[in-house]
């Protein structure tokens, strides 16, 4: 089992960790990149070290981590048997008849590049939408703004609930964990918003289950910049909806915990609506700078 790091900085070591479980312990676990070939005279590899339990770990040197995309697979070796992941094929990538092109990928960016939290490329983007207290009719539409701008996502809500509240959430921990230095120096939450609903709030949910939001002011050139110092602890919406329905829709914290950027797990946007009236938001990328 292995989950690749989403994004890392170029020129810095990359730690790769995997869980290898089976009836027998492997003789070795090896990392190969997409640069290897049966036809090459030399094919560099990185041996993963046993770290206890079922865990194996390796460090890819900074010299190999260049801007672009680092692609690799992991080969589990036992005797004369080889099994390559993520494909699960019982062969080695160096076998002449190995044809599987499936690889794990980690994006590699310049260390000065802003920390991306959300990029719009389709109508999904791992973005979840919810409504409290009950439900709403929702519609997503990808707006192509080429050639001058990147696409944006238009989301429309319509609820019959009295005083509905609409939520957009995206789990981002895996995407930002590979750039801890950039995360630590982030000072502003930035949103590309083409259409902003009244009362829009944006912020984060942390690993403690606490929510920190700030009100969005008018955009400058469609960009809203929120200093992280303006985030304030608030109630956490329990989404998806809590059942049975008589349960409170919110976790209401009794203890004040200061916001800590290293504890960010999810991104959240929210705004209130009016029963029977359509509400709309159109967003592009979201990042920290």
Which residue stretches match the model-derived regions?
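Beta-rich carbohydrate-recognition modules and glycan-binding surfaces
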Residues: 102-289
């Amino acid at each position: 089992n292995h989950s690749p790091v989403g994004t890392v900085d170029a020129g810095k070591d990359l730690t790769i960790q995997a869980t290898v479980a089976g009836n027998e312990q492997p003789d070795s676990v090896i990392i190969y990149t997409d640069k290897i070939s049966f036809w090459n005279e030399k094919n560099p590899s990185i041996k993963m070290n046993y770290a206890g339990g079922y865990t194996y770990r390796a460090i890819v040197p900074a010299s190999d981590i260049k801007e672009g995309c680092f692609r690799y697979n992991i080969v589990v070796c036992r005797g004369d048997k080889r099994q390559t992941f993520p494909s699960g094929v019982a062969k080695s990538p160096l076998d002449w008849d190995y044809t599987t092109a499936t690889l794990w990928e980690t994006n590699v960016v310049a260390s000065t590049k802003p920390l991306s939290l959300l990029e719009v490329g389709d109508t999904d983007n791992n973005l979840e939408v919810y409504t409290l207290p009950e439900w709403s009719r929702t519609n997503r539409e990808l707006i192509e703004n080429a050639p001058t701008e990147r696409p944006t996502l238009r989301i429309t809500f319509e609820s019959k609930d009295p005083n509905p509240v609409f939520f957009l959430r995206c789990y981002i921990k895996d995407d930002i964990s590979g750039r801890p230095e950039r995360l630590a120096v982030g000072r502003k939450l930035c949103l590309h918003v083409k259409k902003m609903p009244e009362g829009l709030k944006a912020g984060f949910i942390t690993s403690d289950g606490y929510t920190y939001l700030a009100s969005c002011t008018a955009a400058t050139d469609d960009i809203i910049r929120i200093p992280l110092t303006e985030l304030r602890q608030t109630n956490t919406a329990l989404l998806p909806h809590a059942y049975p329905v008589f349960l409170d829709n919110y976790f209401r914290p009794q203890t004040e915990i200061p916001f800590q950027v290293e504890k960010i797990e999810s991104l959240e946007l929210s705004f209130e609506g009016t029963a029977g009236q359509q509400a709309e938001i159109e967003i592009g990328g979201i990042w920290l700078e």
